């Protein structure tokens, strides 16, 4: 379950309870890692560019999946029954250490939403799949 990311080799796996060998993070952990590292890098670059006194950034992420009942008027099913909606929720908590004003802290949190991975996850995504021999 190794994968290449440029010159780097990563290991992804599932927990033993899911049939894996637990030799590495599962795919959702890798997704959260991408968002977390991108968030912290974006914040750090912004703070450096603006000369903010930011000593440390910590990003903690959690993923959960919920099912929301469909609205009564929403009826995409052929039999007229409304389909429930499965929603993936990513919870992100950012801890900023340093001598920042309340306004600077608020602006840094706004900048966090501008990291490229955040924009990809919240934007329109197309995934094109093809077979390769």
Named regions from a protein language model:
Residues 1-33, 41-133:
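Extended beta-strand/beta-hairpin segments
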């Amino acid at each position: 379950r190794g994968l290449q990311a440029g010159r780097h080799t990563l290991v992804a796996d599932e927990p033993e309870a899911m049939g894996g060998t637990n030799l590495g993070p599962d795919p959702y952990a890798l997704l959260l890692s991408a968002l977390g590292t991108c968030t912290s890098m974006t914040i750090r670059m912004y703070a450096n560019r603006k000369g903010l006194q930011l000593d440390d950034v910590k990003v903690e992420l959690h993923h959960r999946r919920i099912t929301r009942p469909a609205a009564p008027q929403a009826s995409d099913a052929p039999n007229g029954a409304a389909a429930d909606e499965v929603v993936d929720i990513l919870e992100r908590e950012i801890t900023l250490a340093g001598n920042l004003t309340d306004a600077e802290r608020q602006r840094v949190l706004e900048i966090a939403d501008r990291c490229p991975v955040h924009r990809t996850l919240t934007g329109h995504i197309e995934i094109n799949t093809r077979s390769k021999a």
